[in-house]
Amino acid sequence: MLHGMNQQKQFFQINIILLFFSFFLLLIIFPVGGKIDMYLIQPWIDSTGHFFNRDNWYLERLNHEIVKQIITGIYVIFLGLWLASFKVEKLKLYRWQYGYMFFVSMVGSALVGLLKSQSAHACPWNMVHPTALSYVWDFTAKHGHCFPGGHASAGFILMTGYFVYRLEQPKRAYFYLISGILLGFMMGWAQMMRGAHFLSHNLWTGWVIWAVNILFYTVCIHRFEFEKRIKQ
């Protein structure tokens, strides 16, 4: 028991330190529209200031729509399982996991959406203006509400599964963690190739989702420990 408590305490200490460290790292090393953002966005703009991948089928239809629809389907299943657990006895034991996975993920996604709706940061494709010879960046552009990256959140919210299963099924937990990181990054990168976001937009999305999960997990850790005990 004491060993388990020490492990949980260490887990939270490490994650709080990482959250604070990464917060300042993003502010200092990855400022929105900073050198790294500009360096990584340049390859996707032609000489006239046009993002040539903006209407690319694979990036727009496959990444922006189909992949998101698949992830949405996964969460519809979790919601369905949670609802079914009130009627189906064999699902009752997993009700907490199903509900936590769905509702905490939705809170994380909704928070990103709320921050984005209130943001003054424009999308890269709204910041580029053609000139007679080339193009210029307008960093005063305010329309767009593009920070943080909303699309990437659909991938990053899968990281919630890491917290759901870390005590009972570590392999499944790491599957969700790795899948969430990879999907969030890839979905965000594809949007960057289209000119919809800077890299920093998506990195902040990942940070917000992780912070939300740490907050909820801190509050709910005792319930997860209880769920583990009753299944043993």
Residue ranges of model-derived segments:
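Membrane-interface loops
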Residues: K92-P170
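N-terminal transmembrane-helix/juxtamembrane module of multi-pass inner/ER membrane proteins
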Residues: L2-F78, S117-S119, W125-H129, L133-S134
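Hydrophobic alpha-helical transmembrane segments
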Residues: I66-W82, H151-G161
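Cytoplasmic juxtamembrane regions at transmembrane-helix boundaries
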Residues: G80-V104, Q169-F185
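Membrane-interfacial, low-structure loops and terminal tails that flank and connect transmembrane helices
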Residues: L2-F12, K90-L91, E227-Q232
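Membrane-embedded catalytic cores of phosphoryl/pyrophosphoryl-handling enzymes
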Residues: F12, I17, F23, W137-Q232
